[in-house]
């Protein structure tokens, strides 16, 4: 069977630190359920469409040609948006506060959930 490049980044809650230390990135599948994932995806699109609504060619989730306009949001490294207060978008807060996500970070940092602090700097997507 062919191995995809991303498969080496797959981790579980117990070995995520090893994968992060090795590759600098980790994927923990199946943390969010389908409803949570759909809400996240809608949140991303709602935010991008709102931010660009007054542009000559606004981003539209249903128009793949409009996706080229994302470059005008000035993503760093072709994926990281750090402007327009995007780090405070509601869908990002929903992800940050999801107990399943909090548990992963508390386990990673070996601390209590309530001892975690969050960052507000950016949104990353592929």
Regions found by a protein language model. Give the residues of each.
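Non-heme Fe(II)-dependent double-stranded beta-helix
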Residues: 1-22, 29-126
């Amino acid at each position: 069977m062919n191995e995809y490049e991303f498969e080496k980044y797959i981790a579980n809650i117990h070995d995520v630190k090893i994968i992060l230390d090795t590759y600098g990135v980790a994927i923990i599948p199946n943390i969010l359920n389908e409803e949570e994932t759909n809400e996240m995806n809608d949140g991303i699109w709602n935010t991008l469409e709102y931010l660009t609504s007054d542009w000559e060619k606004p981003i539209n989730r249903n128009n793949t040609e409009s996706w080229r306009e994302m470059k005008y949001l000035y993503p760093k490294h072709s994926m990281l948006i750090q402007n327009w207060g995007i780090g405070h978008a509601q869908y990002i807060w929903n992800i940050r506060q999801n107990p399943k996500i909090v548990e992963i970070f508390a386990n990673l940092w070996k601390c209590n959930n309530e001892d975690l602090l969050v960052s507000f700097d950016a949104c990353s997507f592929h």
